[in-house]
Structure formats: C-alpha cells, structure tokens
Amino acid sequence: MVNTQAREDLHIRLEETQLLDRDCTTLSRHVLQQLHFSPDAQDISSLMNRIGLAGKLIARRLTRAGLLEDTLGFTGTVNVQGESVKKMDIYANDVFISVFKQSGLVCRLASEEMEKPYYIPENCPIGRYTLLYDPLDGSSNLDTNLNVGSIFSVRQQEGNDENGLAQDLLQNGHKQIAAGYILYGPSTMLVYSIGQGVHAFTLDPSLGEFILVNENIKIPEHGPVYSVNEGNFWQWDDSMRDYIRYVHRHEGYTARYGGALVGDFHRILYQGGVFLYPGTVKKPEGKLRLLYESAPMGYLVEQAGGRASTGTEEILDVVADQLHQRTPLIIGSKEDVALVESFIKEQKRISNQG
C-alpha cells in the first residue's frame, strides 16, 4: 500500500515537473534546445525572438484597432501587387523593419508590401540573413474584427548582392532555414519550424512571452475540412469545379473559409484537410505570393508531414523568377492534396485526348 502511494506521488511530481518545464519553455529557449551545439543557434534564436517581438507589437495594436485613429481603413494607395493598402498593412510592415534594423542579424528585408527589398543602412550592424514576410495576411478581415496573421521566412544571403537585385532569393523553397506564422485571434500564437518539426507557442500577456503549447505537430493524413473561396467557382477550370462537386456529393466534408491564409491553414494543420487557392482561367498563376506566403507555408506543412503543391509541382521545388511571383496553392493533408491533384491530372488527360 505504501509502495503504491509512493509511486502515485512520484508520478504526480513527474507530471508537475513536466508541466512546469513546458510552462517555462519560451520561444528563444526552445530554439536553442532545437539547435543544440549549432554555431547558428544564438543567431537563429535571436531572429525568432525579434520576430516574436514584431508579433507582440502588432498584436497590441490590433487589440486597440477600433479605439485608435489611423488604424482601420485604407491609405488610399496601392502596393506593388496592385492591391489597395490598409493602414495596418503599413504599420505592420514598418514594425518588422524597425525591429530588425538595428539587430545586426539581417542584411535585407523583403515584403509583399515593398517593390524592392529594404537594405539595412551602412551605419547599422549588418547580418547575413534575409527576412521575407507578409506583414499582415488577410488584412481585408480587419474592419470586421476577424482573424489576420503574419507569415515569415528566413534565408541566408548567398553572394554579396552588389547590384541590389536580390537574385540569390530567386531559389526554391528548400533554401529556407526557418519559416512560420503569427496568428492574431482570440489568443496570439506563433508557429515555426527550423527544419526539426513544427511547434506552436501562445503569447502569455502576463509574462510578455511566447510559451510552448504544442510540440512536434503532425497534420492528419486526411481531414474533413476543405478551405476555398467558392465565390470563384465559375472562374476556375473544369478540374477545380469537378473537385468541388465531388466534395459536395460525398459525406464527411465540411467547408471552412475565413479569408486569411494563416487562419485557414492553422485549422487544417490541427484538424487535417486541404486549403486551396487555385489559379483561374484568366489568371492561371494564382494570387498568393511564392516567397512570402506559399513557400513558408509549404515548408511548415512538409515538416508536419503534409504536402504543398501547385497542382502539378511541389511548392518547395518551384524556383522563383521574380520577387513577387505568384503561384497556385494546394496545401494540407497528404491524402487530400493528392485527391485535388487527381482531378487536375484527369482534366489534363481529357484535354490531351481532345
């Protein structure tokens, strides 16, 4: 009886210790644990800390968005993508620049909001990494207080980029050394990978720290969710329309689409399924940016055991030919991505026969 009680007490103490260890695992500590004795450990940990700081600043601004002037609404300008720019787009973009400008960690920042990369001034410490980012994904959701996010990717500079064209960034997604996103929702979460699994952290407002909540996340092989803007149905080719008709006819599927890649992908990462943003007949290249959105998410999903595809090619195999290149995106559980691809292959077979 005594031995049984002692074992139970020991088990309780072990559980409490494990919970305490988890509660004490901050983002920077976790990165250092992941990299162990790597010579890059301190730099990558500092990089992630800075990204986390940018996320905290943006999250704080978003929580007061309706109370502050010059926060919601449009600026009246368009970005390099030809899209109307929200005031929070500019704020979020400037936050990342401010956070990294004096860090000594990066040499450039490339954003979907800027036509050309921002080069760290010569009077500031200059690092060897490049941060590519979408400062505020889903900003059309802002005025209705729905989920938005930030997406990031880290690459190492190759060469000296003397001509300022950043051609070394025009490589495939396997060249990324870190990627992730920050989700601004009921809580603020940061999800990242440095090539050793996918890990999720929640911002504890009382501590001001991102605390580990899920380690080594694995996406289910198949899931019930399909996430796509069906308002574009008649703009797609037959393969996409056939896929949508298939999930409408078969039980076990549920549609979820929130208008922000980060929020929609986050659900699929945990529940399984597929997110689609295919090209249209008029714009087969799609809408999402390869370097700032598709490749970082592709890196994450592969680390979690899923897949990301253009429909004909793995996202991480795509070599960019320009900084703001767009690409179709099919991302999620392996079985669900393969199902979408099967409709694309069938349509090509029919077209070739014709």
Swiss-Prot record:
Pfam families: FBPase (PF00316), FBPase_C (PF18913). Homotetramer. It comes from Trichodesmium erythraeum (strain IMS101). GO terms for biological process: fructose 1,6-bisphosphate metabolic process; fructose 6-phosphate metabolic process; fructose metabolic process; gluconeogenesis; reductive pentose-phosphate cycle; sucrose biosynthetic process. Its cofactor is Mg(2+). The gene is fbp. Coiled coil: none annotated. One of its GO terms (molecular function) is fructose 1,6-bisphosphate 1-phosphatase activity. Mg(2+) 1 binds at residues 112, 134, 136. GO terms for cellular component: cytosol. Mg(2+) 2 binds at residues 134, 137, 293. The keyword Flavoprotein does not apply. It is found in: Cytoplasm. The keyword Ubl conjugation does not apply. Its main location: cytoplasm. It comes from the Bacteria. This is Fructose-1,6-bisphosphatase class 1. Substrate binds at residues 137-140, 229, 257, 287. PANTHER family: FRUCTOSE-1,6-BISPHOSPHATASE-RELATED (PTHR11556), SEDOHEPTULOSE-1,7-BISPHOSPHATASE, CHLOROPLASTIC (PTHR11556:SF35). It catalyses: beta-D-fructose 1,6-bisphosphate + H2O = beta-D-fructose 6-phosphate + phosphate.
